[in-house]
Amino acid sequence: MPEQSKAWIDDTTLRVMTYKSGPFIFQLGFELNQVQALLDRVNDSQNRFNKMPSLPLIIDQVQDKVLASSIYSTNTIEGGQFTEQETADILKQDPKTIQKSEEKRLTNLKESIEWVKKSSSKQLAPLSGKAFELSAMFQLHTLVSQNLAEQHNPAGQLRSNRPGQKTVVGNEAHGGIYRPPKCVEDIKYLIQAWVEWLNSPHIISQPAIVRACLAHYYFELIHPFWDGNGRTGRLIEMFILEQSGYRFSSSAIWKYYQTNIHEYFALFNQCRKQAARKEDNPNQMFIEFVLKGMFATIEYLHDQSNTLIHFLLYQTALNDAKFSRKISDRQFNLIHNLMRAIGENSKFLSKADLYRIPQIQALYSGKVERTFYRDIEKLIELDFLSEQDGLLIVGN
């Protein structure tokens, strides 16, 4: 049996020889100058997002939306069947009352994300990495896997395949099948080498996004646990991003992975095969994929936050108009009933459709129909409503 050994080929490349799994190489495997422009755009967008007004109402709503979306996405990637709305509803429940393993997976992910956020930095530091401790990996897998009816996946315990027992990752539809290391001695040795590589001087000083996504990539290749590797790997990526100030986008990117799931899975195999063939820059495509995802994600967060800010300003103006008697209580309630109806029906309404709603009928009880239409006209005149293609729009 070959002896285990490690050797640094250069400042950023660590070659590991295992007992039974052959050689394993940790490397950057990309050209920075080919992604620098996109990396700069990502960091500029994140920096602007971090500097947005920290209004509690805005932050809380963004946080709730990102939490539900992130957990829905990472759970769906692993085969979860809940919708995003069902996920959001389950997350609002007391975890102590939840009995089903499928639902516990969601609350476990919520607890994991909350634990990661304890290490979050408010200041963006894209080139200032912090050490990643092996204990964090075990803690994240424990949080992800705790209290589930899965005896085959002990929380925080490394995988150790019995003789003849196979572990297969992936499928032909997503770029092929991969068989990760099986021997627990090899898995332990590789995980220790992975952390050594991550924390080495020339890797920890790499752009945080690059370091984070490569931490995720190599963790998945080692595949150290029986189950929960995907969820844990994405949380590790999130942890490293949060350490460097990539707030909210660190987990919101999971939506991008889920939306582009075929490319996400296929790139793991494609990069692995390119490395095996000793091609130049085998990790380039995965890094570019993550950078594109980060940029799209942060721009989406900007849009969501701007929408919430505009809504907050709208509500303030509406309250001021009511207080100064520019609009009546009935007109104020008309707008709120319209907003509720739009939210419940997920579509805009015409004036006639709105008038038929029971809440509006109750609001105008004892009034002639013309009063309703006069109120609508007044609210349009004051720019609290607008009309496009016969449909009522909140705002102008």
Residue ranges and their predicted role:
Residues M1-N396:
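FIC/Doc superfamily catalytic core
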